[in-house]
Amino acid sequence: MQQGEGARNKLKLQLMTLRRSSKFRILCFIIGLLTFAASPNCAKADPTPEAVSAFNAYVKTVESRLAQQHQSRNGFLAPPLTPQNEKLLQQGELIIEPVTPITGSALPGALLHDWRGTAFAPGATVADFERLMKNISAYPQHFSPQVLQAKVLTQQGDHLQAFMRVRQKHVITVVMDTTYDITFGRLDDQHGYSLSRSTRVSEIGSPGTAEEHTLPADEEHGFLWRQNTYWTYEEGDGGLYMQIESVSLSRSVPNGLNWIVQPFIEKIPRESLEFTLRSTCNALRK
């Protein structure tokens, strides 16, 4: 009996040690992500009408805030940069932070993400930035490997519609065809902004092969349903301060996988903004 009890205690100790190990956590993380990505019970044909309505209402408040923000040189960036933050940005650092979203309960079956990132491009101007961002066909060059294809569909002055095929790689690779409605505006020659709203997001199956096709809604992973991107940029200190705010809608985390998948989902927007800002700074240096 004592030997049996001792063996059980030894086994418990080994399991506890395993759970604390980084390898065990990584294994659970990967299993959870693969389950999240592959489980047919997780797939949703489309975001619910309630989720879309909540997303649209949230976007309306964001755009109202930005419209007011863009009417004055004071506080053109939000929040206003402190001297310490300006120094960090001028040293090449990025400032990336979440913007408090509405509660998840208001989005049945979906998650809303709102993140903001700021960078500084020495020597760049508002004109340089707009020239870069309006050159849609060059996006695969400047924003590789995320942007695979890009082209302007229609353009009237500072308003255009664009197509982009994008790739997201996080454990699994997802390729999507997207279209955006984009508008550029200026307060003056040193202060500008742009609004980009997704009008279509479709996941592609077997991309780049003879079997390439648009996936039916009920076969999509739901990693991205909606995405709006807002740029704010102003000249100062011999360069250009650039701020991007990204508001997106994706499917929710299945019950029981929150503790594994949630950190991964929160990591995606941060890494996406970091990639976009770094790539933009690099392109402006060329």
Where are each of the predicted segments found?
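Bacterial N-terminal signal peptides
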Residues: 27-38
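Sec/Tat signal peptide C-region and signal peptidase I cleavage site
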Residues: 39-45
